Amino acid sequence: IIQSWSDEARSVALLIQGFDYLYLFIYPAWLALVAIALGTRLGGRWQPAGLVTGWVVLVAAPLDAVENYALIQQLLHGAGAAPAKLALWCALAKFALIAVAMGVLSLALCVWISRRLGRERASR
């Protein structure tokens, strides 16, 4: 597929990969901070869960960087089995880590909302 792209299409794809390098510094840091903040706010078992989730999601950044590198290599030098496999495995691992983190964050957010609503009802 890459070989059928024009030079302009490849340039655009390279630009998008460059922007993705900037984005990979934002989403892991944001998710990690939210995980740690929610864990701290909820306390108890949630505190270490938030800390572990924060660290786990930070592993997504280097996986994303390696995935981007492999994709850029294919854009510059043509499709190859090794870079394609590397990009695939890094992407799968990255999305698995993010999915786990989002699951923990969603559950923690539900607990936080539930506790907050419970306090409001109790204060009436």
Give residue spans per PLM region.
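Extracytosolic (periplasmic/ER-lumenal) interhelical loops and adjacent juxtamembrane/interface segments
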Residues: 1-13
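Alpha-helical structural elements of signaling/regulatory helical domains
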Residues: 7-10, 44, 78-81
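N-terminal hydrophobic alpha-helix used for membrane targeting or insertion
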Residues: 9, 53-56, 83
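Membrane-interface loop-to-helix entry segments
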Residues: 15-29, 88-100
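Transmembrane alpha-helical segments in integral membrane proteins
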Residues: 22-41, 101-118
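Interfacial segments of alpha-helical transmembrane regions
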Residues: 42-61
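Alpha-helical transmembrane segments of multi-pass integral membrane proteins
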Residues: 59-109
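Short, intrinsically disordered terminal tails adjacent to the first/last structured region
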Residues: 121-124
